[in-house]
Regions:
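Short, well-ordered alpha-helical segments enriched in acidic and aromatic residues
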Residues: 49-62
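Short, charged low-complexity linear segments at domain edges
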Residues: 5-6, 48-50
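C-terminal motif of bacterial Sec signal peptides marking the signal peptidase cleavage site
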Residues: 20-23
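Bacterial N-terminal signal peptides that target proteins for export
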Residues: 1-12
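Surface-exposed, charged secondary-structure patches
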Residues: 3, 27-31, 65-113, 120-128, ...
Length: 139
């Protein structure tokens, strides 16, 4: 079977155009927003500001933290002793969800009306094709 190089080029060009118009890939604004929210969360925990850390959690995640601890979020978040996150290594945004890889930790975030919120933290990769294991996650 022979393949016409012009036809392949036209097809790839059309696919690229559709991808751009259809929103393939994350916008820099979404990547920046998710990264900034994750860094604020990590900085709050590093500073011992658990109140701010709780404010940056997604509602279901915060509810789960309080339910598991049978108490308020701040002290419960402190007791989790999440790993200290450092420099950003990368961010992947998939629609309204993001994964932020930082030195020492991986965070998962979702976009809400009020901005990006942390849905899971203290996450470690498992064997290939297995989900991350997270110390902090919503219900």
């Amino acid at each position: 079977m022979s393949v016409n190089p012009r036809a392949v080029g036209a097809l790839l060009g059309t696919a690229a155009l559709l991808c751009v118009l259809g929103g393939c890939g994350a916008s820099p604004a979404h990547e920046r927003g998710a990264s900034e929210a994750g860094r604020r969360f990590a900085a709050a925990l590093a500073a011992g500001d658990y109140r701010t850390g709780c404010e940056l959690l997604a509602p279901e995640t915060r509810d789960q933290v309080e339910e598991d601890a049978e108490g308020p979020c701040g002290p419960a978040l402190r007791e989790l002793e999440l790993p200290r996150a450092g420099a950003t290594r990368g961010v992947d945004v998939y629609g309204r969800d993001a994964m932020l890889r930082m030195t020492g930790d991986t965070l998962f975030l979702s976009l809400f009306h009020g901005g990006w919120r942390v849905t899971a933290a203290g996450c470690e990769p498992q064997a290939e094709d297995e989900p991350y294991h997270c110390s902090l996650k919503g219900g």
